[in-house]
């Protein structure tokens, strides 16, 4: 049984893998599977009082469970998007379309997806794509 549950509606604005140093540190892994949703598409259905927030920056509010410490999502208010950790969404099929921040990768991935040095231009990045 989970202390916190959430649901999303519609489709994510972006889904992929992030290789940035912040995600590596936060997830204790070389790659983080992300799904970015419009803020209005994400709803806490259980345990809202059990959610704590770590304000990494004014553009990044990390949400985690007070009971187990599990990572839930990161709110990016400037972009009006919420990064819900893809593996938390029951029934959600993660269909990645890109690699973000591949310039700081710890491991190489050969999967044919575009690999952005930082972020796609639509998310405020350079849009520069690196070789597969």
Predicted regions: what they are:
Residues 3-132:
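A short Gly-Trp-Pro
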